[in-house]
């Protein structure tokens, strides 16, 4: 089962079945003939922007929308303490323990400006596609992390 088909089925189940949590979603996927590990399902949910929210019918998994994206962007931005650059790379400083999440947030945009990221505990090293793009990359990161 390829990722695209699996994620499409996840979207369908969430929209049609009123799924309350990942455990229920995992069960529904297996009943549909899709075998997936819990860790893979968690990654799929993160990539699809799926959130668990309280509704009139109790807690439900919901597909993220534009407003959810803005909320997440704001939360990720609050974890960033500074963005700095030299001639070859950009450094994003975060609150302790939050660099991985910030690095993953940057990775999900799949920007051609970013060759790669490496996250430690409180620092993300962002490698640009070209040293000529450092200032453009800085602006891009600041825009996507809501930093000043």
From Swiss-Prot:
Its cellular-component GO annotations read:
cytoplasm
Q: Does the keyword Coiled coil apply?
A: no
Q: Name one GO biological process term.
A: regulation of arginine biosynthetic process
- Record Gene3D superfamilies: 3.30.1360.40, Winged helix-like DNA-binding domain superfamily/Winged helix DNA-binding domain (1.10.10.10)
Amino-acid biosynthesis as UniProt keyword: yes
Its localization reads: Cytoplasm
Q: Which family does it belong to?
A: Belongs to the ArgR family.
- Which keywords fit this entry according to its UniProt record? Amino-acid biosynthesis, Arginine biosynthesis, Cytoplasm, DNA-binding, Repressor, Transcription, Transcription regulation
Metabolic or biological pathway: Amino-acid biosynthesis; L-arginine biosynthesis [regulation]
Which GO MF terms does the UniProt record name?
arginine binding; DNA binding; DNA-binding transcription factor activity
So what does this one do? Regulates arginine biosynthesis genes.
Superkingdom to which the source organism belongs: Bacteria
Listed name of the protein? Arginine repressor
Which InterPro entries does its entry note? Arg_repress (IPR001669), Arg_repress_C (IPR020899), Arg_repress_C_sf (IPR036251), Arg_repress_DNA-bd (IPR020900), WH-like_DNA-bd_sf (IPR036388), WH_DNA-bd_sf (IPR036390)
